[in-house]
Amino acid sequence: MIADYEDPASIDAAIESVDAIFYQAQSMGDVERCNRQTETVRKAAEKAGVELIVVNSSMWAPDEPCGQYNFDGVLSMEEIMRAGPIPVVVFRPTLFMSNLHGDRIKDNLRKGLYRYCHKPDLASDWICLEDVAQFMVTALKKPELAGRKIGIGGPDRLTTLEVVDLVGEGSPQGARAIAEDARPA
């Protein structure tokens, strides 16, 4: 079933007769739009009698506003979803391993460069989307998780330089890190 967050009727049709929904909003960009879309989905879920909402926040989020636009935007999305009467479980993955599959990353790796907007010593928990999906499916069977915000990541917390070493092992020319500033120009 295809639904468009900007089209309430398509959301209504997509969640008709379901007990639970998985929700993933955009993780960066227009916070107001994301919040509006989240509220549209929440209201449709309330109207449809959905019993549980499982959210993939797509990234880390603070528990209180921190002053960083994207992180605070994810927090506001979570809080809008949690503001309704339906129990909500939020999963907060840190970084997706599939981020390394993008054309920009691959093109740079072919040149022996690893460019990512993290400092060399920043340690993060990378996770694959398949594992995120497993957490979300498991939440359907664990009602005691309702109301929780759960940070999830892979088994190893890796610094950017450790990721470069691992990625470089799979590249004939190796890889060296190029730290990029995460702030917009």
Predicted features along the sequence, with ranges:
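Mobile cap/lid helix-loop segments that border enzyme active or cofactor-binding sites
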Residues: 179-185
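Short, conserved SAM-binding segment of the class I
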Residues: 37-40, 44
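Oxidoreductase cofactor-interface core, primarily capturing Rossmann-like NAD(P)-dependent enzymes
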Residues: 6-9, 16-18, 28-32, 44-52, ...
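Glycine-rich, N-terminal phosphate-binding loop of Rossmann-like dinucleotide-binding domains
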Residues: 24-25, 57
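Cofactor-binding loops of NAD(P)H-dependent oxidoreductases
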Residues: 2-3
